[in-house]
């Protein structure tokens, strides 16, 4: 919580605090948790209501304030909490919110003399989130900064008006603890992929949906990665883009009609009689199974892709499938880079984390067991209590 009263500006170069800390986060694999600022009650026309530097970082966790702690409901943005959008490369700012105190329910702060101080501000909500992420880091067998950012966005509690208030609340109210997220119920499974990708490579990851599963399914996917930054490029600040593609069914391909035909392309099961009939009639099939759109891009041109999050370092998607629409589904990841607005071909590697949740809305009670039986390579995270050293006048004690 640095305290500069400087709101993000789209057409200006990033503040030095923002650029330096972003580059440090990229080079040293550090996650900074930053208070979003306390000017959210400024008039929107002034622009002063937006998140304050360095909360506009692309590689950090920026935290706003809400008016009620978890699990109290209803909850909303605290009136003073600064709002998004952030700068290009990290438009969803703050990443999320947590209780920071409001006039009729202040935040209790313990003074060094043992007395309490009542206050409010994002400078109090940010340390609460820092504590939760630090505890999570001690529970996971393998972490990097991207893992922590992915968990924060993935398990945020969505507001009932999530889309309409995303500039206010980001991905939602952030957890006080991630311990429960490490325990899956019988109708769900959470799987974490931690890897790195070189420019030009394509990586594939099979989604943990068992072949015997014939029910409807809900899938949540969060991608987080660290990116080098270009401090002199206000609108092209992040240099790396990881393109995420979902292919839900191994046998569903795109069939195109013969040249000159007036018929439209169609998606057909490659193993079906219809597919064989089309092929003998001169139709051609795609080389890869069809994809499921994860973004809201209106088209494939660069402007629409950029607006839909192509260069954002943190993305969260939720998709639903009817029974039979998933078969050996996989995610594919491709890495692009740019420099000064043009595609860059110099070799680099980008570390990333993908967090996937699969749930059965019909509550059949067998999904987790089926996943564990089919995907033997997956290992459940062991619950470990973090050890904390307390300093006292007598001796150091571990608890």
Region locations from a protein language model:
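Extended low-complexity, serine/threonine- and proline-enriched intrinsically disordered segments
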Residues: 218-303
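Substrate-binding/access-modulating region of protease and related hydrolase catalytic domains
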Residues: 1-55, 118-120, 124-126
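C-terminal subdomain of the subtilisin-like protease fold in secreted/lumenal serine endopeptidases
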Residues: 138-218
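Generic beta-strand/beta-sheet core signal
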Residues: 3, 33-35, 63, 97-99, ...
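Acidic, glycine-rich active-site loops and adjacent beta-strand->loop/helix elements
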Residues: 6, 36-40, 66-69, 102, ...
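Subtilisin-like serine protease catalytic core
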Residues: 1, 27-29, 57-59, 86-93, ...
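C-terminal edge strands of extracellular/lumenal beta-sandwich accessory domains
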Residues: 237-252, 267, 277, 294-296, ...
């Amino acid at each position: 919580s640095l305290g500069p009263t400087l709101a993000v500006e789209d057409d200006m170069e990033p503040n030095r605090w923002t650029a330096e800390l972003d580059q440090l986060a990229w080079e040293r694999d550090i996650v900074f948790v930053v208070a979003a600022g306390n000017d959210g009650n400024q008039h929107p026309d002034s622009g002063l209501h937006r998140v304050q530097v360095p909360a506009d970082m692309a590689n950090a966790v920026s935290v706003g304030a809400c008016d009620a702690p978890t699990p109290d409901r209803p909850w909303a943005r605290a009136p003073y909490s600064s709002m998004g959008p952030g700068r290009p490369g990290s438009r969803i700012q703050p990443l999320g919110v947590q209780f920071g105190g409001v006039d009729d329910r202040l935040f209790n702060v313990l003074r060094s003399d043992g007395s309490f101080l009542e206050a409010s501000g994002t400078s109090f909500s940010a340390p609460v989130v820092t504590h939760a992420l630090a505890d999570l880091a001690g529970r996971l067998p393998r972490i990097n900064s991207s893992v922590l950012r992915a968990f924060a966005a993935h398990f945020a509690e969505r507001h009932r008006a999530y889309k309409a208030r995303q500039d206010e609340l980001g991905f939602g109210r952030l957890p006080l603890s991630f311990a429960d997220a490490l325990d899956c119920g019988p109708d769900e499974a959470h799987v974490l992929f931690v890897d790195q990708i070189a420019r030009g490579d394509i990586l594939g990851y099979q989604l943990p949906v068992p072949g015997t599963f014939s029910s409807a399914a809900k899938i949540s996917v969060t991608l987080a990665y660290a990116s080098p930054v270009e401090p002199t490029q206000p609108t092209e600040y992040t240099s790396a883009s990881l393109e995420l593609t979902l292919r839900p069914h191994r046998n569903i391909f795109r069939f195109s009609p013969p040249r000159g035909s007036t018929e439209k392309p169609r998606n057909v099961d490659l193993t079906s009689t219809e597919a064989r009939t089309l092929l003998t009639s001169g139709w051609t099939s795609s080389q890869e199974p069809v994809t499921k759109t994860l973004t809201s891009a209106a088209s494939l041109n660069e402007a629409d892709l950029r607006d839909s999050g192509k260069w954002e370092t943190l993305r969260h998607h939720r998709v639903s499938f009817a029974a039979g629409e998933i078969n050996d589904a996989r995610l594919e990841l491709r890495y692009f880079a740019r420099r000064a607005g043009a595609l860059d071909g110099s070799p680099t590697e980008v570390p990333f984390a993908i967090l996937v949740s699969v749930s059965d809305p019909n509550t059949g009670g067998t999904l987790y067991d089926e996943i564990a039986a089919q995907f033997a390579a997956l290992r459940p995270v062991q619950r470990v209590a973090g050890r904390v050293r307390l300093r006292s006048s007598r001796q150091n004690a571990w608890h």
